[in-house]
Amino acid sequence: MTQHKSSMVYIPTTKEAKRRNGKSEGILNTIEEVVEKLYWTYYIHLPFYLMASFDSFFLHVFFLTIFSLSFFGILKYCFL
């Protein structure tokens, strides 16, 4: 029997590479992880499993507003 060589090549993500190299510590990384967990918890899972559609709508509007204002703030900071 011959074994077939897999054509799939694993490439680690940037986050995995930073953890492996020991560069994942720091306040910015901690904030990034908290925001990512908050996003996945409240923006992705809750609207589909636990919330009524009216509550889900307002949660979506809240996160989109925060994102839009953050994006505007970054652009204003960079260009003005």
Swiss-Prot record:
Kindly indicate whether the keyword Transmembrane helix belongs to this entry: yes
Q: Where are the transmembrane segments?
A: 54-74
The record's GO molecular-function terms, alphabetically, read: enzyme activator activity
Q: In the UniProt record for this chain, what is stated about the effect of gene disruption? A: Lowers the level of total sphingolipids and increases the phosphorylation of YPK1 in the ORM1 and ORM2 double knockout background mutant.
A single GO cellular-component term from the record reads: serine palmitoyltransferase complex
- Where found in the cell? Endoplasmic reticulum membrane
Domain of life here?
Eukaryota
UniProt keyword terms in alphabetical order? Endoplasmic reticulum, Lipid metabolism, Membrane, Sphingolipid metabolism, Transmembrane, Transmembrane helix
Alphabetical GO biological process terms? 3-keto-sphinganine metabolic process; intracellular sphingolipid homeostasis; positive regulation of sphingolipid biosynthetic process
Entry membrane topology: Single-pass membrane protein
According to its UniProt entry, the function of this protein is described as: Stimulates the activity of serine palmitoyltransferase (SPT), and thus plays a role in the biosynthesis of sphingolipids.
Subunit details for this protein? Interacts with the serine palmitoyltransferase complex LCB1-LCB2. Component of the SPOTS complex, at least composed of LCB1/2 (LCB1 and/or LCB2), ORM1/2 (ORM1 and/or ORM2), SAC1 and TSC3.
This one is known as Serine palmitoyltransferase-regulating protein TSC3
| Species | Saccharomyces cerevisiae (strain ATCC 204508 / S288c) (Baker's yeast)
